[in-house]
Amino acid sequence: MEIKEEGASEEGQHFLPTAQANDPGDCQFTSIQKTPNEPQLEFILACKDLVAPVRDRKLNTLVQISVIHPVEQSLTRYSSTEIVEGTRDPLFLTGVTFPSEYPIYEETKIKLTVYDVKDKSHDTVRTSVLPEHKDPPPEVGRSFLGYASFKVGELLKSKEQLLVLSLRTSDGGKVVGTIEVSVVKMGEIEDGEADHITTDVQGQKCALVCECTAPESVSGKDNLPFLNSVLKNPVCKLYRFPTSDNKWMRIREQMSESILSFHIPKELISLHIKEDLCRNQEIKELGELSPHWDNLRKNVLTHCDQMVNMYQDILTELSKETGSSFKSSSSKGEKTLEFVPINLHLQRMQVHSPHLKDALYDVITVGAPAAHFQGFKNGGLRKLLHRFETERRNTGYQFIYYSPENTAKAKEVLSNINQLQPLIATHADLLLNSASQHSPDSLKNSLKMLSEKTELFVHAFKDQLVRSALLALYTARPGGILKKPPSPKSSTEESSPQDQPPVMRGQDSIPHHSDYDEEEWDRVWANVGKSLNCIIAMVDKLIERDGGSEGSGGNNDGEKEPSLTDAIPSHPREDWYEQLYPLILTLKDCMGEVVNRAKQSLTFVLLQELAYSLPQCLMLTLRRDIVFSQALAGLVCGFIIKLQTSLYDPGFLQQLHTVGLIVQYEGLLSTYSDEIGMLEDMAVGISDLKKVAFKIIEAKSNDVLPVITGRREHYVVEVKLPARMFESLPLQIKEGQLLHVYPVLFNVGINEQQTLAERFGDVSLQESINQENFELLQEYYKIFMEKMPPDYISHFQEQNDLKALLENLLQNIQSKKRKNVEIMWLAATICRKLNGIRFTCCKSAKDRTSMSVTLEQCSILRDEHQLHKDFFIRALDCMRREGCRIENVLKNIKCRKYAFNMLQLMAFPKYYRPPEGTYGKADT
């Protein structure tokens, strides 16, 4: 017997009027007792002794489930089972589930209508509300067999929560069979005898036993309110599939939107505006420049101000979005939604097996991070950035070329300056406060903190880039002579001794000026260290004279420069504050001089990047910001969900703070036409996630939405946890240790465009991406094996042969095989075994993504949970016809059809083809 399903379910919660769900009159109805955050009601169906309308006809049966609300008395089509072919005793694998927020009561009536499907390719169920007892008009491809109805309270109060109802014709007269309705409670032990149901499966009898063992908690249910603050609008589906030993396993499939789809882009855009306003102000404060450079500065500021205004407008528009928490695929080209990820959802499968632990499997599905509004006529970021840097390197005399590494370094030093200067000032004031209190211990502690921060400050200026930037800025002042465009030294030059003879300087590209004193910066910079040494020496002297038995941590410095301590005159002990105050003032003055010079010179470096090819470089920055915003929203969503589900797993938490997390992206984009540009955008966006770190903090209020800090080169995402959850974390994480992620992307095009690329085009982009990211994955595995404790590694290796999987993955990447989906299966398996975060992406995360995640789910059921081999294809069809992914299609394009045609599907790998009747023409 072959099972196929009709693409006909509708999630009723999307179609009931809002007022109905919150009707004041609802209080007179009896609510269903339920577990918080669990579905209110789940049941499964089976029919027996169905009467065919035509003698000897083999029935192809489905059941349509409708809901009659006790107030409205209107019928809402809610969902459907799959189609079971060739039997009068169909047993349906697709169940019915009502999520926790659905307005259902004991008085709610459920209507079950049984159809005989004659033409699956035309069979659909349209959403509509009909008066009670009115049958829908005849639909193409099906014929009505019979119906039955019951109240929810009758089912819940029945013996063993099982109803056997007679199916009657539309006039209520003739009985055409029976239908069994059985309540499902996932994870509970079923009392009494197991329910034996026999069904004909491809010519053999298969006894399916419905029994479950006591489960272990999949994830702490205490965590669910926290997760629900991030996830919204869940769509739930229920299935039962037989195992290889003919027992039932139960599967709950869930798909949820995330409010982070809009929250993260708004956070990020706000940071961009703040960063760009600060940069613009620093450019304005560069001081007097020669006419050439001043004109460049004015031009840069004009364009930068326009860019800031654009970001502010986008932020204003995003703040108006208060409805849906996801961006549909049909909106991917909208300018105001550019920063928002496309169709971001959590795809979750919860499995309850007879003999295995309950398990959760999560995949984040999202459209490939790409700048759709900008278009792909000239390619994506990977190509555009390479071309831009090549052209900038060969620019004319009017600009100074700084490599991307040096530009990033300038931004890093500027950021460090802005962070460290106020910190040092604070610690200096604390030192004075300790002196006024005459507390030796407090004085030593304050000095230790001041020394550490000041040493970091001094170290920030050791880079040769600062020296060359100072000289470049000097030549740009009025009267400066620009004999040759200055450029920073390479890393090898930076590491060379700085005491080379001056004659060697003529060989580099740094300009010279007869009045420029190259040693002046060294003196200014060194004065900070000397000022600190004076403070250390004074503290040592004060504590020593006070009779302290221990010196401060700066004794070594005092020994190196004994003249400092010798030069300090003796003072009475009550004058500690007065003796330290002028030294602190000197330190602050020296720092101010260093900061002023360094900020101006490094800002001049940033001016060079902006001055070249305006507005192209700003448009590239915009494109990169857009792509990164989409990628980051998905990453933060995935990280929070992974943290919630693994919060009480000590091994995972140790891996989190010791190694970091692997984040694996599965790409399904072709290397043909516009999708090449999408893949180029996606590759850069995912690579940019390396500059993101996470920090877990305790939530001080009910607001647990993440907060982002930092700048374009380095972001920290602060994830807030309720106190009870926060206390369960290891000390290292609670103390604020930064948690790192290792993003990797593996792409295999599977559609008909990839066929064209493989035969007539170029697949080198895909090959390069896969090879590069394999090396990153291998590096992560190496770090994982080195840093995790030996006892953990020993147990881990017993359970997983990752080395063999990695070797197999490398062989497949190097094999040059067309549409080698084995690459994706292996990468996904490795990611799961390494406790990683899984993503699946295609252009809009709707069609190809749906085929991939459903295949992955069924493969997991087969490989990890003993799904009966004869039911693999049927399970796959169930999930594709009546599962969450067909609901995703409906949410995106208001049509229950995957956007494939027969010609396209001929090019798809076998297991990536949807079942008949679920695909066709759809406007996307």
From Swiss-Prot:
GO MF term (any one): phosphatidylinositol-3,4-bisphosphate 4-phosphatase activity
Protein name according to UniProt: Inositol polyphosphate 4-phosphatase type II
Family the UniProt entry places it in: Belongs to the inositol 3,4-bisphosphate 4-phosphatase family.
Reactions catalysed: a 1,2-diacyl-sn-glycero-3-phospho-(1D-myo-inositol-3,4-bisphosphate) + H2O = a 1,2-diacyl-sn-glycero-3-phospho-(1D-myo-inositol-3-phosphate) + phosphate; 1D-myo-inositol 1,3,4-trisphosphate + H2O = 1D-myo-inositol 1,3-bisphosphate + phosphate; 1D-myo-inositol 3,4-bisphosphate + H2O = 1D-myo-inositol 3-phosphate + phosphate
Involved pathway(s): Signal transduction; phosphatidylinositol signaling pathway
Function: Catalyzes the hydrolysis of the 4-position phosphate of phosphatidylinositol 3,4-bisphosphate, inositol 1,3,4-trisphosphate and inositol 3,4-trisphosphate. Plays a role in the late stages of macropinocytosis by dephosphorylating phosphatidylinositol 3,4-bisphosphate in membrane ruffles. The lipid phosphatase activity is critical for tumor suppressor function. Antagonizes the PI3K-AKT/PKB signaling pathway by dephosphorylating phosphoinositides and thereby modulating cell cycle progression and cell survival.
Enzyme class per UniProt: hydrolase
Gene that encodes it: INPP4B
Signal peptide: none
Domain C2: 23-165
Keyword annotations: Hydrolase, Lipid metabolism
Tissue/organ expression: Widely expressed with highest levels occurring in the skeletal muscle and heart.
GO cellular component: cytoplasm; cytosol
Stated regulation of activity: Strongly inhibited by inositol hexakisphosphate.
One annotated GO biological process: signal transduction
EC numbers: 3.1.3.66
Stretches with biased composition (Basic and acidic residues): 1-13
